[in-house]
Amino acid sequence: MENWRTAEIFPKLDVSPNVFDDIRTQTAEQLFENLRLYYGDDSDRYNISFEALLGIYCNRTEWIDFFHTSIAVAANVIRFNDLDKMSLGKILFYIQLPRVATGNDVTAPKETTVLVTKYSEKHPINISFELSAACLAHLENTFKNTILDQMLNINAIHTVLRSLKNSADSLQRGLIYAFIKTILKKAPPQFILKTMLENKVNSKQILSKVQRSNMFQNFKNKLINSLFFLNRTSNVSFIYRYLCEMVDSTTESILNNTNSYVLKDGTPINGVLLGTPNTIQILSNALSQHISQMTMSVPVSYGTFVMGKENAVTAIAYQAIMADFSNYTKNVATETQDQNKKSEIFENQTQHADLKTNIIQLSDKTVVLDHLKKVYKNTNIEDPLEQKLELTFFFPMGLYISKDSGFSTMDSRLKLNDTMENNLPTSIYFYNKDKLLQRIDYSDLLPSLCHPIIFDCSVSERIFKNAAKPTGESFNQLCQVEFVREPPSTFLSNLYNLYEMKKEIPKTTNMLKNELTTEDFYKSENFTLKTELHPFFDFTYIQKNRSTDVLCSPRILLGNIPLPLAPSSFHEARTNQMIEQAKTNNLNYDYTLKLVVESLTNTAYPELAYIIELLIHGNKTAFQILKDVVSQCITYWYNIKHILLFCNNFEMIWLITTYLGDESIPGIAYTHYKNIISILKLVKRTISISNFNEQLCGEPLVGFVNALFDNRLFPPFLNSLPKNEANAIITAGNTPLTQNTVKLRNYEVSDLNRMNLLDSTEIFTDVDRPSFETIVLSKIFYFCFLPALTNNKMCGAGFDVKSFILDFFYTEPFILPDDNFCELPITNNVLIELITEAVGPSHALTDLSCIGKQLFKSILYLTENTKILEIESSLDPSQRHGSSSNFKSLQHVLYNGLCLVSPINVLKRYFKPIPFNRFFSDPIICGLMNIEVQTYLNIFPHYQRNDGGFPLPQALSHEFHNWQRTPFFVYASCCSNSLLSIMTLATMHCKLSPIAIILQSRQKIHPGFAATLVRTDCFDINCLLYSSKSATSIMIDDPTVSTEVKDISTTYNLTQHISFLDMGLGFSSSTAIANLKRVKTDMGSKVQDLFSVFPMHAYTNPTVNSWVRHHVGIEKPNPSETDALNILSFGKINKQSQSILLHGQQAICEVVITPVTSDINFYKTPKNPRGRASCMMGVDPHNESEARKSLYDHSRVDSDAFVATTNPWASQEGSLSDVLYNINHRDQLGYNPKSYSPNAVFFTDTEIFKTNKFMFKLISDYSIKTKTCLDSDTDIQYSCSEGTDDVTHRPCQFLQIAFPIHCSSNQALLESRSKNGMTQLSETHFANFAIGECIPLQNIIESLL
C-alpha cells in the first residue's frame, strides 16, 4: 500500500484539463453505451470493437464547488497541509471587550481581555474508485500513429480524468455533508435556544426547582407553538417574526471578516438560512416582499493556516506537526514578526468571484436563503434537513358529561336528536391522514378490553401487598376494618352484640370513597386513592390476626364501581340506553308507582298484614284459605285509606294477581297489583340484552350479563329453597345444607316432628320449588323495586311463630270441638283489634270472629321460625378466572322472614328486627323495635342513615364479599321513586365480565367505563437551519491517496482530512421544524390486539375462552406450548391483508381504561395519557426514592391537572394500565417482544426515570450555555447536548406528553366543525364534546393532499 498525493499519481502524463470536455463535445451522446450503472472500470471497454470506439461515458451530473454553495457562508476555510497528523486542536483567542468612556468622577472601566478556548473536531472523509488493468496498460504506452490506438488511449485518459473529477466532486459533496452535519450538532432547536435565552442564569449558579420546572414547561410550550410553523398559518408576519427570532437567538462569530460574502453595495452577509427545496419554496412565496436576488462576492480559494500576530492563535497542541513552534514564538513581539506570512484567517487576500443568490432581510440581518438540492441530487444520501418525527396522540371515548353540568358552546349551529347515543356517546369520531372519517366504538376495543389479563389482578395484588402499609391518620382510616365469620346458628343469638357494646364501627374504604364527590375523589387529599387500582377489583386493608393485611376481591357488578367514578346520573343514562334499545320507553306506570310509594311509606300499615304474610308464606293452598280475609283487607285499605296492602311482599302480589282477579277486590286495586308484576317483567325484558334460550357452559347466557339472572344470587327473602343449580353452599346451622338435610314440609298430615323443630336451625321447604322466572322477578322486586320506591326505608324481621301460635290460637274457642269452635266468638281483644284495624270498624264481632277462625284454619300450613341463611358461591365461569378463581361470594338471606316497611307496636314481642342486608336495615324501624339499637343510635346519631352507613352485625357485614356493595345502597337511598330508578338498580347488576362487555358493546350500551386511546404516528419533516457567517472554521489539506493493486484492477482510496472549529461567541446556529413533508402512518383506528401481545393467556374455562375469542374476532385458538415459547423468545409479527396498507402503515391505538368521570378538560391540552404527569423537574431524578414518589405518590398534587390524577386505574403503581404497559411488569406476564406499544414510554418506570435524568441533565447543560463565552465560562464549547436530536425527533417520549387530536363524540359535531375549519377549538354540546388539536395537523395534512 502506497500513499500518494493527488498530483503525483501520473507525473509523466501531460494532458489538458479540458480533454474531457473536448471528447464529450465531439461524440454523439445518443450513441453512448454506458448508460447503465456500473461500479469501477470495466476492462472490456478497451477491447478493439466498434462499440468501444464510441463507448465514451458522459456524466451529466452537475459538479459541486463548495464555495459556490450557500452553506459556505457559515464557514471559514483554510488549508493546513499537515492536518492528517493532527490529533487534537486547542486554540486560545484573546478578545478585547469594548468599553465606554465615562465622566463626572465615575471610575472608567478597566481594559478587559477575555481568553476564549476552542477545540477542533477531526472529521476525515474518503472516497474510492477503480481503474482496470487494461486502462493502466494503455496509459503506459505512448500514442501510436493509428487512429484506433489514439482513441483507445484517449478513452483510458478520459476514464482516469472522469474518475478523478468524480472523486474530487465526491470530496466536495462530502465536505458539504460533513460540514452541515457538524453545524447541526451545534445548532440546538429554536424552542430550546429561545427558552434558554429567556431564562439566563449564571453558569456557576445551581438551578432551583422552580427555574428548572419553568424551563421544562417553556420547552414544551414553545415546541407546541412552533411545530410546523410554516404549515400552520398563512400569517406572513408570524412566519417573519419567527425567522427573526431564529436569527436573533444566535451569536456572531469570533471571526468577523468583512471582505468575503458581501453584497455589491458593500452590505455584509450575516448568515445563511438553509432548508429543503420545498421549505425554501414555501418561504419564498410567503415572504416574497422580503426576498430579492442579489450578487455577493464569494471566495474561490482556501486561506492558508500560518502563525501571525494578527490571528490571535497563541497555542496549538498539534503534536509532531508543531515541533518547530519555538521558531515562531522567538519572533513574537519583535521587529521580525512581520517576516511571518500574513494570516488569511483575518486578511483574506484570496481571489473572489460573484455569485447570484436569494437574500432575505430578517430584522437588521442580511441572510442568504438557499437549499442544497444540487448537492444530494442523484446521490444515495438524504438531505440532513429532511428528518423523521414521532408524535403521540391521545383522545377519550365514552366520557360522561353530567346533565347538571351540561351546556352548549355551539350556539345554534347544531341540532341533535334526543337519542341515547347522543345523550351518552359510546363512540369517538376523527379523520385519518386521507381525511376519511374514522369511528371507534366499544365493539372495536374488544380485542383489548376482553383479554384474560384484564380480568386477572394477580400482579396488581402482589404489588399492593408489597407496598408500604398506611401510617398515621391514613392507617386509622383505612386499616381498622375487621371481618368476622360466625356459624349461622349464632347469627340470631348474637344479633345485637355490636349495639350492646356501644362501639363505633370503622368505615370500609368503599364507604369512604362513596362519601366523596367526583371532584374530591381525584384530589390528593383523598387517601383512599391508593386502593383504587382496577375497575374490576376492590382493594382494601383489613385487620387479620392483629396485623394489617390486604384484601383483593372482584367487584362482580358494574354498580359496585365507586359512585365518584360512575355516578348515579351515569347509571341512569345507561339505563335509558337499555330502555331505548329494548324499545320499552313508552309505558306509563306513574300512578301505580305513586300509590305503591304512599303505601310503603305509610306509618299506619296494619300489623295483621304481616301476620297474614307469615301464615301464607307463598303457599297457594294457604292463600286460598285466607282469600276472603286478604280480599277484605285489601278492599278496606284501598277504598278507605287508599293504601295498597302487601306491596312489600312479592309472593303475596304474585298470588293476588293469580287468584283475586274475580272481582273479589276493587278492579282498580287489582290493576295496580297487575301493574307491579308488569313492571317487574318490563324490567326483566329491558335488562335482557341476550337471548334467553342461548346457553353457555350449561347456563343461560343472560346470566353471564346480569346477576339478576344468575342462579348464584338468591333473593333476600325466601320461604322455600329454590333449586340449587349453582351448587352454592347454603348454611343454616353449623354445617352446609344438603339434599338429605333439607326436609320437606308435609302439610297434609300431622307433622309433629316439624312442629317440634319450629324454632330450631333445621330447614324445611315446600315440594313445589319456585321457577327460574319467579326467582328472577323476586330478585328484581327486592333488589330494585322496593329499594327504589322506599329509599331503603325497610327492615328485615323475624317472627316467633311458636310463641304467637300458643298465645293467640292455643286458647278458646280455637281448642274447643268443632261445634263450639263455630259458635263461640273470639275473646282475645288484641286479635280483635288487629283484625278490626285490618278490615275496618264496620264489621260486627261475629264477622271479626269468623275472620279470626279463618286465620286459625291456615295454621295447618304454618311455617317455621325465621332463620338467617349464609350462602357462599363461586362466580360464573367467565368471572372465575385468575386471582378470582377461588373467590367465594357471600350473601345472607332471611328464611321465613318479613320485610317491614313500618315498625311493629302491638306485636312487638313476637317480632325481631334483623338488619341482615343494607337494603333492609332501616335504623328507625330497628330502633323503635329494639331498645339496644335505640340506645346505640342515641350515642351515635350519625348512624341514622339509609345509605349503607348503619352498621350491620359484624357476622353479616362482609362488604367486599357481597354481591351488592355500598354504591348500590347510596344510590337507592337518594334516588327518585320512579320506574327509571327501578331499572337503574337493575342495570347496575350488570356484570363486570368479558361476556357482559361483549354483549353490551354489540348493543351499543355503555359498559360502565371510558377509554383513553393512545396512538403514535410517524412523519417526514423538513427543517430549517440558520448559521451565522463564518460560524465554523474548516481546516483541510490535500487529499491523500492509497492504492490497492489487484490482478484485474487497482483501487484508489482518496482521504480528505478535515477539522472543524467552532468560532461562535455562543450558539451561532439553530434549527426549527419548518413544515410537514409527508405522513408515514395512516393516523387511523386500528386497535391493539392484546391477544397477540400476550399470546399465552387464556380464560380458565375453555368454553368461555373459545366463546370470547370467537366473538372478539380472534378465530385462531391459543398457540401451542411450543409456538408460545417461540413467540415469547423471538416475537411474532401478525400478517395482515395488503388492503389495509392502502392508507399507509397502520398506527396502533392502545386502550387505557378510564373512569367515565375523568375531566374532559384534561384531554384538551397536551398531557400524559396515564392521567398524571411523569415530569420530575421538581425533584432530583437521581434520588430514586423521591423520583418514585413523584411518579406514584398520589398524596402529592399532579403538576399538570392540579389534582392527584385523572385516572387512578392507570397512574398508580400496580394499577391495571401500569401492569399492561409497563415493560417491567410485562416481563412477568410473558409478551410478544415484537409487538409495538405506544403506551410503553409513558408507563415503564425505569424508562421514565432515565428520561427525567436525561432532561434534568439537558436543562443543566443548556443553562450553562445561556450566555456567551464573553460573559460566562470561557472554556464552554457551544454544541448541542447529547440526546438533543432525540428530544427533537421524539418529543413526546422526553416531554412525557401526548397531543390531543381533532375528534368528537358525535359525527355531526365533527363535520360541523371541520367544514368551518374550527379544528383547534374545543367545544361542548351538552353530553357531547369536541376536542381541538393543539397542532393543526388536520388543516396541515389537507393542504398536502
Swiss-Prot record:
Homomultimer. Makes the hexons and eleven out of twelve pentons. Interacts with triplex proteins 1/TRX1 and 2/TRX2; adjacent capsomers are linked together in groups of three by triplexes, heterotrimeric complexes composed of one molecule of TRX1 and two molecules of TRX2. Interacts with scaffold protein; this interaction allows efficient MCP transport to the host nucleus. Interacts with capsid vertex component 2/CVC2. Interacts with the small capsomere-interacting protein/SCP. Self-assembles to form an icosahedral capsid with a T=16 symmetry, about 200 nm in diameter, and consisting of 150 hexons and 12 pentons (total of 162 capsomers). Hexons form the edges and faces of the capsid and are each composed of six MCP molecules. In contrast, one penton is found at each of the 12 vertices. Eleven of the pentons are MCP pentamers, while the last vertex is occupied by the portal complex. One of its GO terms (cellular component) is host cell nucleus. The lineage of its organism: Viruses, Duplodnaviria, Heunggongvirae, Peploviricota, Herviviricetes. GO terms for molecular function: structural molecule activity. Signal peptide: none annotated. Pfam families: Herpes_MCP. InterPro entries: Herpes_MCP, Herpes_MCP_upper_sf. Keywords: Capsid protein, Host nucleus, T=16 icosahedral capsid protein, Virion. The keyword Cell wall biogenesis/degradation does not apply. It comes from Human herpesvirus 7 (strain JI) (HHV-7). This is Major capsid protein. Belongs to the herpesviridae major capsid protein family. It is found in: Virion; Host nucleus. The keyword Magnesium does not apply.
